[in-house]
């Protein structure tokens, strides 16, 4: 589909079925909000990140970035050093309890394979704010297949035992491992973050070279299909992919193949939106990502769009909004 046809069909569909989400007061649940104040906790990776991310990003900045949108957010851990996990989690829980922030819940960081993991989990289980946990699995220091190690599987099972979910942030080449992990942990609910790290540049090489951890389009699609089929309650977070494209050189249709495959494979009841701010700034301000996604889904039924933007997240995370 060429860009002109994409824009024409999207615009026409928007007039017939998407007016709800062109209104500024339509609720958006951002399931993937990052915050860091280096005076409190400094994620180690920030020092080597692109310059746009080598700053503090606090609630006031998030509010400014989302001006004009009716947003409530779920904090997403920022890959701090393990020694700072408790400090990070305690800080965001305190912010949520203060009630003066759009952040209403949290996915905290942790190490499921650690010996004291259950003690850590018990500290936050049942507090009403912490909904789950994640560990970044696509870093160079994490070996391939790590998520299937006995210690890791044991830890992820522990989350389900205490009513918490696990969010999968991993290499697209290992999505079939994710499907195996899900089957090994039947009592734990899962979210696949960032569309399984699908890279839009794999669909359109004109956008530039793909990431070193990228895979072929067919391999990524098979991985997404495997995760979706692994269990009927696995969710997919439509997030992260705008960070892969060059700023100012992409259009909504460049993201559409990744988004649409995830939406079609998981179905309208198993997807929700994530802003990935401020990491999204590698490709776009968060408003640019929101506008692009609205355009991509414009032809879908309004009820499905409501599920994507807010309804599914409210249900899955048990949010009170």
Annotated model-derived regions:
Residues 83-102, 186-192, 251-264, 289-296:
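Short, electropositive alpha-helical surface patch
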Residues 28-38, 192-195:
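Histidine-centered catalytic micro-motifs
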